[in-house]
Amino acid sequence: MVADNEPLIVDNTQEQRYELWVGEVRAGVIEYDTEPGVVVLIHTEIDPPFEGRGLATKLIAGAMEDIRARSLKVVPICPVVRAYLRRHPEDRDLVVRPSAAQ
């Protein structure tokens, strides 16, 4: 069970976004697109009343955990996700590397 103040991360596949919930309030999202074996992380947003609490980091970490559990890879388009990956080398193995042919 999750306490009311403990953030909960949910993959809303219908809307193609990871959602971060604080109690009954959706506090943030990561919008994504999918390709075979890959999740393209497009945009991260934390609602203004929840900014400055480290929730973007928790949301991205939760998304990375889910992506890893599903044996998928990541294309980080979102600058917030890219900044997270610079600070969290433990998740860099999930990033799809461009091929030499590109």
Regions found by a protein language model. Give the residues of each.
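Conserved N-terminal entry element of GNAT/NAT acetyltransferase domains
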Residues: 2-11
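Conserved beta-hairpin
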Residues: 16-27
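General beta-strand recognition
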Residues: 19, 38-40
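Conserved beta-strand in the GNAT
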Residues: 25-33, 40
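A short, internal acetyl-CoA/4′-phosphopantetheine-binding micro-motif in the GNAT/acyltransferase core
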Residues: 44-51
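Conserved acetyl-CoA-binding loop-helix of GNAT-fold acetyltransferases
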Residues: 52-64
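C-terminal structural segments of small proteins and small subunits
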Residues: 65-101
